[in-house]
Amino acid sequence: MESKAWESNNEDLLSSSGVTSNGGSSSSFFVSSIRGTIIENTSSAGTLTQVPFFPKYEVELDSPRKIIPSPGKEHFERVLEEYSHQVKDLQRRLNESNELHEKQKFYLRQSVIDLQTKLQEMQMERDAMADIRRRESQSQEDLRNQLQNTVHELEAAKCLKEDMLKDSNTQIEQLRKMMLSHEGVLQEIRSILVDFEEASGKKICEHDSMSTLHFRSLGSAISKILRELDTEISYLKGRIFPVEDQLEALKSESQNKIELLLQQHQDRIEQLISEHEVEITGLTEKASSARSQANSIQSQMEIIQEQARNQNSMYMRQLSDLESTVSQLRSELREAKRMYEDKTEELEKQLVLANSELTEARTERDQFSQESGNLDDQLQKLLADLHKREKELSLEKEQNKRLWDRDTGNSITIDHLRRELDNRNMEVQRLEALLKALKSECQGQMERQMAAIQGKNESLEKVSSLTAQLESTKEMLRKVVEELTAKKMTLESSERTISDLTTSLQEKERAIEATNAEITKLRSRVDLKLQELQHLKNEGDHLRNVQTECEALKLQMTEKDKVIEILRQQIENMTQLVGQHGRTAGAMQVEKAQLEKEINDRRMELKELKILKDKKDAKIRELEARVSDLELEKVKLVNAGSERLRAVKDIKQERDQLLNEVKTSRSELNNLSEEYEVLKRNFRNKSEEMEMTTNKLKMQLKSAQSELEQTRNTLKSMEGSDGHAMKVAMGMQKQITAKRGQIDALQSKIQFLEEAMTNANKEKHFLKEEKSKLSQELSTVATEKNKMAGELEVLRSQERRLKEKVTNMEVALDKASLQFAECQDIIQRQEQESVRLKLQHTLDIKELQGPGYTSNSSLKPRLLQPASVTRSHSNVPSSQSTASFLSHHSTKANTLKEDPTRDLKQLLQELRSVINEEPAVSLSKTEEDGRTSLGALEDRVRDCITESSLRSDMCHRSNNSLRDSTEGSKSSETLSREPVTLHAGDREDPSGCFTFTSAASPSVKNSASRSFNSSPKKSPVHSLLTSSVEGSIGSTSQYRSAKPIHSSDSVKDSQSPPIETTGKTCRKLQNRLESLQTLVEDLQLKNQAMSSMIRNQEKRIQKVKDQEKMLLK
């Protein structure tokens, strides 16, 4: 049993050793020791017992076996008791070790708390140290400044000392130079004295020579020489005085001679003045003759001017009549000006509204800029937050580097001091340069002083030279006295000639000046006279033109007088024939005179209106040109605006995209920052936990190592230990291996966390790069936004200008259209009145040719309807009937709206055919002449009426088209009335506008014959003026049917004078109709162009408004 127990114990030990072999290095050492003991037991088995398998602890029990030769139960019990005691001791030790471990944990926690408090205290101390260092740095900076100031002061003192030394050195050098110069001067004086002794042969010093004299004795020698020179000068002065007396005598003689010469010259000047006066009198006589000629020319010019005034008075009388019309037009212009002023006030109000809109737009722009600024501020705040985060990280890194920074700070301070020293050296160099400049100035001053000293020396030399010159002057005086006597004679002769020449020159200059003044006066007079002659020539030309105009007017007046005389003869003949109508003839003459005056006045008004019309046409053309230019500019601006709007839209889209990207990036940044902070916190917590766990594990390892050492010591010391103790030891080893596994897991976690930290740093670097990129993109977006804001402001200003221009152009076009419509209405009225007056005039003429109307049956259809109408409308005045006639024709003519120009051309062709038929017409009798003239006149009158009605229709159409175009109507709606269907005969016949059916012709004829027989005294003029429209139209058709009969009968006789006048009036009417036709065509084209331009402008304005609405949306 015991052997089995030992075997089981050995197996357990082996199994435990196998289990524990998977542990660390200490467990392997323990197993190796146990295996060594087992091998020893197996080797010693043969000597002790014969059992094949020995127990495990046989080696360890060798010592008790040696002591106790025979093992027994007591021994085993003792051993078991000892092992139990050992186990109890081990359990007690384990409990103690656990208690110690818990105490160590508590102490560690307390130490951690203490360390945290110490860290806080250290931080407080660090802050205090930082404050102390700041104060020390400030104190050090103050000390540095003080040291620098002291260094500056020392440098300044050093510079001053150096300057003093340099000044003293320069003064010493100057004194040396002065000494040398004085020595040279003294040597020169000595040499001069030696030369003076040699020249004069006198000895200055009796005992010594001048070459051996001392410098101190030179003064006495010079004084002696000066005394001697003074004595000689006084002697020479005594000799010069008589020479001066002689010179004064010579001067007095020369003055007397000069006075004589001056008297002679004055006499000569007086002679020349007298001669000059004689010449001036001759010139004045010539000038007076020229003035007389000019006066005669002026008298002739006055006569011509009087004649011109008389003629001008005649013209002024004519102009007075015109001025009355001008006054009326001025009143109209004043009214128009008032209208314009009202419109200008309205435009000013619109400008005030536009300015208010501008201010609103500016406020919107400011708000937009503020919003953009707020966005920029938000971006800057985010960037500042990021910078703060980065600064916090950098501060955490800098906390470890502050000790190194202290050393670097000292080195930086040293570098700063070195830089300051370099700067000071630079300043010292600058001061040295200034010192050099001052030195150069001082040298210049010293040179000037030396030059002054040299000047003094030169003055001394001059004194010595003067002494030599005195002797030379003595000799020269003698020569001069001799030369003076010779030159006096030459001076006298030259003075005489000079005085003569000067007097002659003065006289000539005076004469030249006087002649030049007279020449300038004469030239000015000649210029004035030439100007007057040119003015007179211009007036003469004007008078000639006026005379030619007067002659033309006279010819016209003679022609008119001839016509009037012919008419008077006819009137006299007609008065003899028509005595009954004398009263009416007088009234008609008065009316005729009034009508002539009115015709002349209306002609003048028509001319003025034509002039105004031409001016307005020119203005309209200018406005059209401006409108075209403005349209081109508007098209360009609209295209540019559309392009810019597209660009603005694209940029806005890009900006929105970028803002969305920025927002997403901001959200990502916020999320990343939050995650980063969370990771930081987690990392800090985990790092603290890991530090705590590592510290705990280290303590546990230390305690376990100490326990293992204790167990090893106990196992070595103990013998015969039990398997239970081994199990306890193996349990301890298992706990140690488990704790080592925990330590490995924690190390792997630490590595994982370090890798996570590296990844986080990489992500942080990547986020920094993205942040820099985003900041750059934001800066570019901000610049582009500013550019776009500027471009938007420019576009808005351009749009406002275009709107203002469009409004101005619309107002101008409205004004032009209104003025054009008014002009057209005035022209229509004037033309209608002129046509009415011409009708009255022609019918008055034909009234005076009136007898014999009842004899011919061909006149019955003509006077059929008028005679019947005169019964009912005899009391109605002629003007009202003609007005109703014209208005009815105008209403009938309004039905033709398809092609008015075609009808006008056909009417002109008819008028030309009528004019070509007129010269061939010649009747044998006066009755037939009157019939043909009346028929032709009535045809022409009716054609003129139809043409005037068509013209009024055209004007109404143009006015309606203008108004419809300004109101924004379409091209198909220019005609304001519904089209009226025409008959086939109206479309085929060009003159069928006023033809009617001849169904009622026989009844009309019967009624006409009865009425004419019953009232033979009625005049056809009155009947025509009071006739209705239907009778006139029926008579036109009957007259035209009767034309070939008259043309076949009227080939024999010549044409009468009234027919000639009617032909002239028809030609004039034809010319006027052609001009009116061209005007109507031009006006139609202009109206169409203006309507198209206005529509295009309206379309463009609508497009611009739509674009603005889109932009606002």
UniProtKB/Swiss-Prot annotation:
Keywords: Coiled coil. Residues 72-183, 243-833, 1061-1113 form a coiled coil. Residues 1-26, 848-902, 955-1062 are annotated as: Disordered. It holds the Pfam family CCDC158. Residues 15-26 have a biased composition (Low complexity). Residues 1-14, 867-894, 955-974, 994-1017, 1024-1040, 1053-1062 have a biased composition (Polar residues). PANTHER family: COILED-COIL DOMAIN-CONTAINING PROTEIN 158. This is Coiled-coil domain-containing protein 158. It comes from Homo sapiens (Human).
